């Protein structure tokens, strides 16, 4: 008679796995992305820098990001679905001086537009830098293109 409870436990365990799997279909933002970032002067449009990055969007609304720039930390942040294929995200990371000391905290805020088949996205946003007293010391504008990692 212990077979029935064991089968019920097995069946209950399968249901959450199926729900989790469906939340990560390519039509959603969830998952790993290869990102090309361009930071510009907001007033002139002049390119300040180009950066390669990886973004990981998790189904619970959290995200992490890492970039090719060695003078900064990894990023932690949040994202949410607004409507249709439009999302927003915000993440922060630390920038360091050449000697390794703290320089600023950077906050990236962006609007994400996912393409119809869920394989690419583009963004527009801002990058704000804050000093150790949390005073904003600079702001830049950003654009990104991304492809889903395979």
Regions found by a protein language model. Name each.
Residues 6-16:
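Bacterial N-terminal signal peptides
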Residues 26-45:
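Tryptophan-anchored aromatic micro-motifs
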Residues 25-30, 56-60, 80-87, 112-122, ...:
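A short, structured loop/turn motif at beta-sheet edges
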Residues 34-40, 88-96, 124-130:
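Generic short beta-strand segments
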Residues 1-4:
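Positively charged n-region of N-terminal signal peptides that target proteins for export
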Residues 127-150:
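Edge beta-strand at a domain terminus
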Residues 89-118:
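Acidic, glycine-rich flexible loop segments
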Residues 45-86, 93-94, 120-121:
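N-terminal glycine/threonine-rich, aromatic-flanked beta-hairpin/loop signature
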């Amino acid at each position: 008679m212990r077979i029935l409870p064991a089968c019920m436990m097995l069946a209950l365990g399968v249901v959450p796995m199926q729900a989790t799997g469906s939340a990560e279909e390519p039509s959603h933002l969830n998952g790993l992305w290869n990102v090309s970032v361009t930071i510009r002067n907001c007033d002139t449009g002049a390119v300040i820098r180009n950066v390669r990055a990886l973004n990981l969007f998790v189904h619970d609304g959290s995200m992490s990001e890492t970039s090719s720039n060695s003078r900064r930390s990894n990023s932690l942040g949040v994202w949410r679905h607004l409507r249709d294929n439009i999302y927003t995200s915000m993440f922060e990371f630390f920038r360091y001086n050449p000697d390794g000391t703290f320089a600023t905290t950077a906050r990236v805020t962006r609007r994400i537009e996912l393409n119809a088949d869920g394989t690419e996205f583009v963004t527009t946003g801002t990058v704000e830098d804050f000093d150790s007293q949390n005073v904003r010391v600079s702001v830049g504008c950003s654009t990104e293109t991304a492809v889903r990692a395979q």
